Curated annotation (Swiss-Prot):
InterPro entries: Phosducin-like_chap/apop_reg (IPR051498), Phosducin_thioredoxin-like_dom (IPR024253), Thioredoxin-like_sf (IPR036249)
Protein name as it appears in the record: Phosducin-like protein 2
GO BP field: acrosome assembly; protein folding; sperm axoneme assembly; spermatid development
Gene: PDCL2
Keywords per UniProt: Differentiation, Endoplasmic reticulum, Spermatogenesis
Domain of life: Eukaryota
Organism placement in taxonomy: Eukaryota, Metazoa, Chordata, Craniata, Vertebrata
Job of this protein: Essential for male fertility, spermiogenesis and acrosome formation.
Subunit description: Interacts with the CCT chaperonin complex and actin.
Length: 241
């Protein structure tokens, strides 16, 4: 008679069809499973804790645990500092003229600063503020601020608004003055993102200029118009003859 516990391919097939009972686990397999469960149970609880939880529970650890906890705490602290450094800003903040030097010119070293000088009565300025607010959340490592133009520069002409200055280490790295330079009255979020990425102020994930299709259409339209005009001119010359 065939041993139902014999480890053969045929027995495995019979078990799959329910003809033979499930194979009994050997002593070695049981011991291996027990050891695995014991190993999983030995995972230190502090490896799943936050910094605050580590602080609360530190009295419960023995000396050996405390050495591991301290190493783990330092690792978590470094991760936290790196995250805080990366997510330093994250919003479009309003500043006044007397804050300009501290917030913009003397901003933290190697931090990109984008400031929008605006007037709330100009629709294009409101559109730019709306886009910058979204970009500030998307790129928290870059500092985004806005200021009413009169608080910074007296008698600034409306035709120069909106005005966007891009600073780094106290220097103006780029500027966009007026509606045309800022992208036009139909400016889209992705177009402004591309402009700021081109000067290095943000690291975009856009792969190409969002206005490329529009530019291609304009060039094609101009080319077609030129061909049409040349054709009309040629036909006119033939008619004259």
């Amino acid at each position: 008679m065939q041993d139902p516990n014999e480890d053969t391919e045929w027995n495995d097939i019979l078990r799959d069809f329910g003809i033979l009972p499930p194979k009994e686990e050997s002593k070695d397999e049981i011991e291996e499973m027990v050891l695995r469960l014991q190993k999983e149970a030995m995972v230190k609880p502090f490896e799943k804790m936050t910094l605050a939880q580590l602080k609360e529970a530190e009295d419960e650890f023995d000396e050996e645990d405390m050495q591991a906890v301290e190493t783990y705490r330092k690792k978590r602290l470094q991760e936290w500092k790196a995250l805080k450094k990366k997510q330093k800003f994250g919003e479009l903040r309003e500043i006044s003229g007397n804050q300009y030097v501290n917030e913009v010119t003397n901003a933290e070293e190697d931090v990109w600063v984008i400031i929008h000088l605006y007037r709330s009565s100009i629709p294009m300025c409101l559109l730019v503020n709306q886009h910058l607010s979204l970009l500030a959340r998307k790129f928290p490592e870059t500092k985004f601020v806005k200021a009413i133009v009169n608080s910074c520069i007296q008698h600034y002409h409306d035709n120069c608004l909106p005005t966007i200055f891009v600073y780094k280490n106290g220097q103006i790295e780029a500027k966009f003055i007026g509606i045309i330079e800022c992208g036009g009255i139909n400016l889209k979020l992705e177009e402004l993102e591309w402009k700021l990425a081109e000067v290095g102020a943000i690291q975009t994930d856009l792969e190409e200029n969002p206005r490329k299709d529009m530019v291609d259409m304009m060039v094609s339209s101009i080319r077609n118009t030129s061909i049409h005009d040349d054709s009309d001119s040629s036909n006119s010359d033939n008619d004259t003859k």
